[in-house]
Amino acid sequence: MANSQRKILVTSALPYANGPIHLGHMLEYIQTDIWSRFQKLRGHECHYICADDAHGTPIMLKAQQLGMAPEEMIAQVNVEHQQDFADFNVAFDNYHSTHSDENRALASEIYLKLRDGGYIKSKTISQLFDPEKSMFLPDRFVKGTCPKCKSEDQYGDNCDACGATYSPTELINPRSAVSGATPVMKETEHFFFDLPAFEGMLKAWTRSGALQSEMANKLDEWFEQGLQQWDITRDAPYFGFEIPDAPGKYFYVWLDAPIGYMGSFKNFCDKRGDINFDEFWAKDSSAEVYHFIGKDIVYFHSLFWPAMLHGAGFRQPSSVYAHGYVTVNGAKMSKSKGTFIKARTYLDHLDPEYLRYYYAAKLSARIDDLDLNLEDFAQRVNSDLVGKLVNLASRTAGFITKRFDGKLAAVADKSLIDSFLAKQDVIAELYEAREYGKAMREIMALADVANGFVADAAPWQLVKQDDKQEEAHQVCSNALNLFRILVTYLKPVLPRLAKDVEDFFRMELTWDGLDSDLSGHEIAPFKPMMQRVELDKVAAMVEASKENLQATAEPVKTGPLADDPISETISYEDFAKIDLRVALIQKAEAVPEADKLLKLQLDIGGEVRQVFAGIKSAYNPEDLEGKLTVMVANLAPRKMRFGMSEGMVLAAGPGGKDLFVLEPHAGAKPGMRVK
């Protein structure tokens, strides 16, 4: 081994358990998986841990819409997530859920330690409340205009446009994202984490090298604005963990979500039995803990999380690594264009190794966005993996099998092999630093050299000459040695290809074994290892993404539309036949013989109509007199046993007490046409 063994725990952000994985998500899991596989390839003890983030109001509401219990829904999503990851060759050592006994115990433990340390404050707050749904609105379920930059349609906790954080009550023109109703203020008791108490510690930690410089600079801006106490409470109804000693109060999902890293690792330790949880999480731990995350959740992972850990007596992360967003063809992922591609849709059409390589080729240690240009994707995979890498073996392996009994020669001139081996430290340093793009360029530069060597030597010409057989054997053996080194360098990125190459060489590809002498080593017959990317398959994937959108475009409706769907479409000509007029209710009286009817005398501007309206359950007759309303004036008269009804007034609502007669704004006059 090149260096002493390290103890490493690495995590990716926990995917939310209310929907499928897409290619934007996959960037992070591929990035982390490459790093984890590299550490293991180098001989280190590395554990890659993840879980589904399974709590919160969105989970609760989605389950309600599907007619399922939240526990049932998150269990189903967990299976789907794990299958997607497995098929992309993402090798977690443990994949769990935040809705677990381990996570409940750890969340309660951390909370109680923070409370005992004086870091939990209680106060009564005024919070937005949805009067239609009778529920307090979590910050992500309030939308409105950002109070900082004035961008519209922003969530109640932070602005996607400017990155500002704020409370939902600061939003301009807030509305409930659940019902669309204008929320009202209502008092409730909440618990707060005293984040400002950790400012000194956080300033030191964020400048300790634990963060990328871009992240550290962004945090300086937040420090200048001043840290705020963090509301860690949500009111029932809520799907999550109830706060100890506080019935009806639940932990905010962002409190127990990062603790999910610990919960999943605890589950892993208990299953294994030979790994000590405290060796990785105790305050004096010498192990390394790394979190890979997206840039949109930096605030939680670089302020709240280390402060919570410190206050509860645990260690802080060694580093938090953030990445940018994925764009497709230079633009934000789009459902209408078919570029919002689910992981499963990709897998239905293309090899996952293609995307693993393409992402690796474009990833750096910076927080830059990564563009998945689908045309470039096909060209790069075909050029690098098929044209350079696999082609190196396909052009030479057949000669070894057919002419030299499948055995490699002892390479007389090892200068080329030595030059490839000389790059292993450089490539290792690039992997370690998450500079995958630079590592891929180094490896592909070597592939160019190897292909140039084969092209110049032309073994297909040498084998035709009796006196050149040994030279042909040497050239092909040399080329396959170079191929083995290249695939070993790429093993963290292309695990499936590496396995195929291991079967071909009949040996494991190891970093320590890069300089193995393969003289006389017998190889298996060569089989095709990778197909070219066909653009028609890429196009089919995009088209399938559009079709998936068509299938799911109709959202699960809640509220009035769920109970009373919109009627079939009518033509404009049909609508134009309806004559709607403003009417003054001159007189209203109950119809004794009828349970639902009021008899109305309506003035429509020079003519008085008698109309029977089924609104008795919602209105007292005297409350209607003198009000304006809207009636259908050209409806054919209808003879009823109480008299003739000469039209219809318009009202909204499901019935009973929930009926609301339409009333024009001030200024409207009886007889005016409504159009």
Curated annotation (Swiss-Prot):
Family that this chain belongs to: Belongs to the class-I aminoacyl-tRNA synthetase family. MetG type 1 subfamily.
PROSITE patterns, alphabetized: AA_TRNA_LIGASE_I, TRBD
UniProt motif 'HIGH' region: location: 15-25
EC number(s) on file: 6.1.1.10
Pfam families given in the database record: Anticodon_3, tRNA-synt_1g, tRNA_bind
Protein's UniProt name: Methionine--tRNA ligase
An MF annotation (GO) of this entry: tRNA binding
